[in-house]
């Protein structure tokens, strides 16, 4: 409490210092940003945006222009002060800054001190914005950026399933709802630009960031990503999809360092890896793009004129600004090692088309080499004006020069994490769950069960069962808690059984290591609990220690002692249900052969326990469909949809086929398709056709069905995929 009071006192005192010289800039219907007493064109809300951009550029110095081309990381990471201070007039951002990332969102040095109650966070951003508007010469507002791939990356914001789970819903309308919730909460808290969605396609399940992807198919990822972009920007925010481009297929799935060396041919790059971004820009009008760390064919993407100008701007008509992933610019000099000096590094990225550099280091580390590169003639003033103009255009489009203080500093709690938003979170958790196996209709379980054993390292886990770039400190309901609350009259007991990983992981994946005394005791406890129970529900999978950025794997089997736990509990002879809570595909061949019922829940978010309980006991009929292929062996990888002829052919000495295919998912009911109609039997290159059919629920339960349409060419000028999805529709 003392820290918060001190911070607020500092805020007020700073505000009083500034107020005397700036109180007259706020006019009726306009703001005198440059404090000259005249309504300049860039200050006129009625003037065309291009005219406002040109007028502002004409008034800017070299120092002011270059300051727009860098990010200032907030929350004590680079910006060490919680509130503006008099010392800021000596910092490089005295001439402005392009954007401030993750300020007062609950991460970093200040934690929840500034982020919650929510009004503190809004007031903090308003005071920082006020400093830039009132204390810099031209008063150019800051773009406050934040992450948001599974809900807004803010303390106690509404949490949704990880993007891999959102992909499993196959529900475009739901993604639009998630986008609106994220946007509404961002707006209420004063953020203006959300770094979402991730449009990387997950073609290699070993890769650590598959958890953050909508799936392996470019059509599905593009359609869902388009809805996220449209939903965010419909509420007045900028959406910045990432990571452009060809980022998600590093050789061997190895994630770390620069994520270099994607072995992707040009045609595959365009049809698979660029297609979701093309949709996001051409069809949804994304105002931002984040450039990636990796190279393509030896050229770093963040320094590539081909990617950032020829493809983005010339081919696709991109009108926003490109921000680098953190340290992607510096990698040209330090890791890719293609620019001998920092000045050449700055010149290459700016000439290529990059607008804003981001890194966890002070902005002057880029701005000063940038200025030297300009003075040395490595960057023309024309190019500089292009890059800065693109940044300013987005700021005008966001309305920052008309209202630089968005957000509700009085009652943001009426918006953030409200009841309606929690309903959308619950809906998303339910729709993301995929039923993988249901032998003899073992599921749904009877609600009259007396003794239920909930076993496994993910049964009572909270902290590690999310992924990055989303809400923190949300009240997550565990699977054990969810089942216990769902059946208050049953005896529901819990045993951990083992940890997600053992102490020798990942080396233990290379050879058998005997169980130590503690590990054996944990498994024994779980076995004894199963023996005295009517059923054992095992909750296994992964967590942030096994799947996330920089956490790639060389195996897709269950980690640690989980397989031994599963087999030991199964050996008791009691009925077993397996619930997988994980962020990637797993080679659960043994479970698929022996365990009668398997459910995959991904990382469902704050209503994890409630949603899984509803599915297991029949209050909700699971309708999720896999957005990634489950291989039988890691040796089959890469093994992802869409396939080319021959890539899934049979062999004599290798494992063939998939464990679960892309688009797969069972239901508690059955559906019948009939009366397929095609409007035209033959169409030309630029013509359309309409297909329709009748889908009938032939079972005894209500349920959802994802109608999937796949097409292929009989003959084509080049080798193409056997079939590709072209439409999807969720019906209930």
Model-derived regions, located:
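Glycoside hydrolase catalytic-domain context in secreted enzymes
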Residues: 16-723, 727
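Bacterial Sec-dependent N-terminal signal peptides
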Residues: 1-20
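Cationic, low-complexity basic patches in intrinsically disordered or flexible, solvent-exposed regions
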Residues: 730
């Amino acid at each position: 409490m003392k820290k918060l009071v001190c911070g607020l006192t500092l805020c007020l005192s700073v505000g009083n210092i500034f107020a005397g010289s700036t109180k007259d800039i706020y006019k009726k219907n306009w703001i005198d940003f440059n404090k000259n007493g005249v309504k300049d064109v860039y200050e006129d809300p009625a003037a065309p945006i291009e005219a406002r951009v040109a007028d502002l550029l004409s008034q800017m110095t070299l120092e002011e222009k270059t300051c727009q081309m860098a990010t200032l990381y907030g929350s004590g990471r680079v910006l060490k002060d919680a509130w503006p201070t008099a010392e800021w007039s000596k910092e490089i951002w005295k001439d402005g800054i392009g954007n401030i990332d993750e300020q007062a969102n609950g991460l970093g040095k200040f934690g929840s001190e500034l982020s919650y109650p929510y009004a503190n966070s809004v007031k903090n951003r308003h005071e920082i914005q006020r400093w830039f508007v009132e204390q810099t010469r031209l008063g150019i507002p800051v773009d406050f950026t934040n992450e948001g791939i599974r809900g807004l990356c803010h303390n106690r914001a509404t949490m949704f399933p990880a993007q891999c789970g959102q992909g499993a819903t196959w529900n475009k309308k739901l993604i639009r709802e998630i986008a609106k919730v994220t946007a509404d909460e961002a707006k209420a808290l004063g953020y203006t630009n959300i770094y979402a969605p991730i449009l990387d396609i997950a073609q290699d399940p070993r890769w650590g960031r598959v958890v953050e992807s909508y799936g392996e198919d470019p059509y599905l990822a593009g359609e869902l990503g388009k809805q996220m972009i449209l939903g965010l920007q419909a509420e007045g925010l900028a959406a910045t999809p990432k990571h452009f481009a060809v980022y998600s297929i590093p050789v061997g799935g190895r994630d770390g360092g620069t994520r270099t060396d994607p072995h992707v041919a040009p045609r595959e790059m365009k049809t698979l890896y660029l297609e979701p971004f093309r949709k996001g820009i051409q069809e949804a009008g994304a105002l931002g793009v984040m450039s990636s760390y990796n190279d393509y064919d030896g050229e770093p993407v963040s320094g590539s004129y081909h990617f950032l100008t020829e493809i983005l701007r010339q081919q696709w008509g991109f009108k926003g600004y490109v921000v680098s992933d953190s340290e992607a610019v510096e990698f040209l000099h330090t890791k890719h090692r293609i620019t001998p000096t920092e000045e050449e590094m700055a010149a290459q990225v700016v000439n290529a088309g990059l607008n804003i550099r981001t890194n966890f280091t002070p902005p002057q580390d880029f701005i000063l080499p940038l200025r030297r590169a300009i003075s040395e003639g490595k960057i023309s003033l024309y190019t500089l004006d292009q890059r800065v103009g693109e940044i300013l255009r987005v700021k005008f489009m966001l309305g920052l020069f008309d209202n630089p203080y968005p957000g509700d500093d009085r009652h943001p709690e009426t918006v953030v994490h409200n009841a309606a938003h929690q309903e959308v979170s619950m809906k998303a958790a339910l729709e993301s769950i995929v039923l993988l196996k249901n032998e003899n209709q073992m599921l749904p379980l009877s609600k009259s069960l007396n003794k239920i054993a909930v076993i496994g390292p993910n049964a009572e886990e909270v902290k590690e069962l999310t992924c990055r770039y989303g809400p923190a400190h949300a009240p997550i309901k565990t699977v054990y808690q969810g089942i216990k609350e769902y059946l208050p009259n049953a005896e529901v007991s819990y045993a951990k059984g083992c940890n997600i990983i053992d102490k020798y992981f990942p080396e233990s994946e290379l050879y058998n290591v005997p169980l130590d005394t503690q590990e054996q005791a944990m498994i024994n406890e779980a076995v004894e609990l199963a023996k005295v129970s009517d059923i054992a529900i095992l909750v296994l999978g992964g967590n942030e220690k096994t799947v996330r950025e920089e956490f790639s794997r060389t195996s897709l089997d269950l980690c640690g002692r989980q397989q031994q736990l599963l087999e030991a509990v199964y050996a008791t002879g009691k009925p077993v249900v397996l619930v997988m809570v994980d962020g990637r595909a797993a080679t659960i061949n043994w479970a698929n052969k022996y365990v009668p019922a398997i459910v995959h829940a991904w990382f469902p978010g704050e209503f994890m326990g409630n949603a899984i309980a509803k599915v297991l006991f029949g209050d909700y009929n699971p309708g999720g469909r896999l957005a990634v292929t489950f291989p039988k062996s890691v040796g089959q990888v890469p093994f992802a949809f869409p396939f080319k002829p021959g890539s899934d052919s049979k062999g004599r000495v290798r494992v063939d086929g998939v464990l679960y295919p892309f688009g797969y998912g069972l239901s508690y009911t059955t559906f019948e398709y009939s009366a397929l109609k095609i409007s035209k039997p033959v169409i030309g290159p630029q013509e359309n056709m309409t297909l329709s059919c009748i889908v009938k629920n032939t079972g005894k339960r209500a349920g959802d069905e994802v109608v999937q349409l796949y097409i292929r060419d009989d003959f084509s000028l080049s080798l193409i995929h056997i079939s590709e999805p072209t439409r999807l529709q969720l019906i209930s």
